Swiss-Prot record:
CC terms in the record's Gene Ontology section: apical plasma membrane; hippocampal mossy fiber to CA3 synapse; plasma membrane
Gene: SLC39A3
MF annotations from Gene Ontology: zinc ion transmembrane transporter activity
InterPro entries, per the entry: ZIP
Cytoplasmic membrane side: 25-42, 107-169, 218-229, 284-292
Protein name listed in UniProt: Zinc transporter ZIP3
Amino acid sequence: MVKLLVAKILCMVGMFFFMLLGSLLPVKIIEMDFEKAHRSKKILSLCNTFGGGVFLATCFNALLPAVREKLKEVLTLAHISTDYPLAETIMLLGFFMTVFLEQLVLTFRKERPAFIDLETFNASSDAGSDSEYESPFMGGPRGHALYAEPHGHSHGLSVQELSRSSPLRLLSLVFALSAHSVFEGLALGLQEEGEKVVSLFVGVAIHETLVAVALGINMARSAMALRDAAKLAVTVSAMIPLGISLGLGIDSAQGMPSSVASVLLQGLAGGTFLFVTFFEILAKELEEKSDRLLKVLFLVLGYTVLAGMVFIKW
């Protein structure tokens, strides 16, 4: 039990610094070199697809079985017997909640992008994409994306433009990313087995670090002051540790209410992972015409690695 607590605390510290460094390093050192940018895009795209496989294994091989097991305990204590797939229903409620949050944010932004994705690395509509519309989380300033072709254009808004035009828009974006991260942290904090904590941490670390890099590149592109960028980065980076802390608090409480809360929150967090996997990662990465088979290989590799880790007892 002590080892599990230590593992979760290390996850809190690790996630905070991974996201903080991912957000701030581009602001400090990145140079607007298009050749370098395109090379980085391929590497980041493969890492993102690998993370998609990690999330698939995390959701279906770790989270869903854990929710089913915990739910069975709760129903037994409450003397309730049912064959209804409650675990799957709770998880889908989390999925729909995440979709609603995305659409709520996009209503304020009045545009079409996905909730949080890495399309910042290829925000122009060109021959490399099957989609008529590109969807950056935050595009570059003056309508040009970081990785846009000379004649390309972006439908996104930069951090700088958002902060100038409407503080509410910038706050809505930070809120969306923060809420998203809190639920990922909750899933970590509520785990009761070491191998599930490790496998979940790997998936969250890969995805959230890449998202942090995307955010950092946009802040660098918009020439945001380092102090302002640091405030934004610290806010977003603190959300996963906050979620882990909430999960630890719920997990340490005894009794039926804490067990019910644990089941509900783990299920809702599982729905968030479903959204991340299919809407943010796979839908965006597999629509690109380049390196499709290589991406599928990395997707399967990510799943295989984490599915194998589920069998390891830590």
